[in-house]
Amino acid sequence: MHLSQLLACALLLALLSLRPSEAKPGAPPKVPRTPSGEEVAEPQAAGGGQKKGDKTPGGGGANLKDDRSRLLRDLRVDTKSRAAWTRLLHEHPNARKYKGGNKKGLSKGCFGLKLDRIGSMSGLGC
């Protein structure tokens, strides 16, 4: 029985490792720039160059804009999840305020609430 469970787990792990992972796109390729900051056109492969007047299929500029917005959206989600993990791991930012023994002058009731003068005198706070 244990051997079949072990074999099933190994098979599942093998299938998961073969499945292509959904990786985030890497950094966009850097475009060489001139010292004045203008982009330099990269030379095309032999015979595959396009003329200045030719339009790229799919709208060229729209694809670049979509890629940038998708990258920004992915970064924003990552920031939110990172903040959630930080809050989870660090119990409270002002934890020192709540730690420590009882301070002088604070009377605590039965449930940890501060009692007023009448409740502390008469015992009606509980």
From Swiss-Prot:
Any Pfam family: ANP
Annotated segments matching region Disordered: 20-71
Compositionally biased region (Gly residues): 46-62
Residues that make up the propeptide removed upon maturation: 24-73
Cellular compartments annotated: Secreted
SMART domains documented for this protein: NAT_PEP (SM00183)
Keyword Ligase: no
Disulfide bonds: C110-C126
Single GO BP term: intracellular calcium ion homeostasis
Keyword presence, Cytoplasm: no
This protein's GO CC annotations: extracellular region; protein-containing complex
Signal peptide residues on this chain, from the entry's feature table: 1-23
Family as reported in the entry's similarity comment: Belongs to the natriuretic peptide family.
Protein's recorded name: C-type natriuretic peptide
Organism: Bos taurus
Gene name for this UniProt entry: NPPC
